[in-house]
From Swiss-Prot:
Name of the gene: atpG
PANTHER family: ATP SYNTHASE GAMMA CHAIN (PTHR11693), ATP SYNTHASE SUBUNIT GAMMA, MITOCHONDRIAL (PTHR11693:SF22)
Name of the molecule in the record: ATP synthase gamma chain
Organism per entry: Rickettsia prowazekii (strain Madrid E)
Gene3D superfamilies, sorted: 3.40.1380.10, ATP synthase, gamma subunit, helix hairpin domain
Any GO BP: proton motive force-driven plasma membrane ATP synthesis
Lineage: Bacteria, Pseudomonadati, Pseudomonadota, Alphaproteobacteria, Rickettsiales
UniProt GO MF annotations: ATP binding; proton-transporting ATP synthase activity, rotational mechanism
TM segment ranges: none
Amino acid sequence: MSNLKQLRTRIKSVKSTQKITKAMQLVSASKMTKIKTQIANSNFYIEAINKMMSDICSMTSCELSIEEQKFFNTMPSKINLLIVMTSERGLCGMFNYSIIKQVKNDIKELTNKGEQIKLIIIGKKGYEALKRQYANYINSYFEFTKIHSENLILQVKEKIMCAVKNLEVSNCIIYFNKFKNAMTQIPTKQKILPIEKHQDYSVVANDYFEYEGKNLISNLINLYVHAKINYALLQNIVSEEGARMTAMENATNNANDLISKLVLKLNRSRQTIITTELIEIIAGAEAV
């Protein structure tokens, strides 16, 4: 009888866990749909800002201020600023592992070339995975849950802008998971500085950059860096929710399979007990 009690307790526990995983699956699905809409709405903006920056790359150095040139020219220093986006929470499969593995491989490759590294880490999981081995490289760490997304973007942007203006970094690379579908997230690294010309865009006249005065290009650079961080952050968040939704769906299905097996085991145990009791009753009756 104690075995039956243990089985019933375990079935109850698994059913309780299944309710939690199902709820998490539904929440992630809802968040994913909402963020996908935001990404779709921002695609046109990203395309426009990329084209404008590509046009600016065609301008000569004398047309740019000294401060502006710093964002387009490769600096003599070999210091790389790596911005790593991960999640605050787990329960999302291989989501964090894939991007952290890529970052570690790139750090090893860059250091072997004699280049220096600075890290800006967004997300608790990334910080926990990198702090032990690369504590000396970490410049900043942001807990996403404690900072509103827009404030986070502004803080990271200011870190980047100051580092470039002070000639502290030569390259800025952002690491994030790019969303393909709920089951597939692509670990992605994107070089955002120095700004380079895109071959996909044709060159247009530079006259219209002068209409708003000498600060127009500086403002565009600010918008460009902001847009790149925002895009990567949205992609990373929707990828996280997709990965968590898939992981929780698998967990829910596994819980359902486990419940079926436990119920079958419970029924067989009950049947064995009943059969044993019947045999004992029949044997007792025959003895009388």
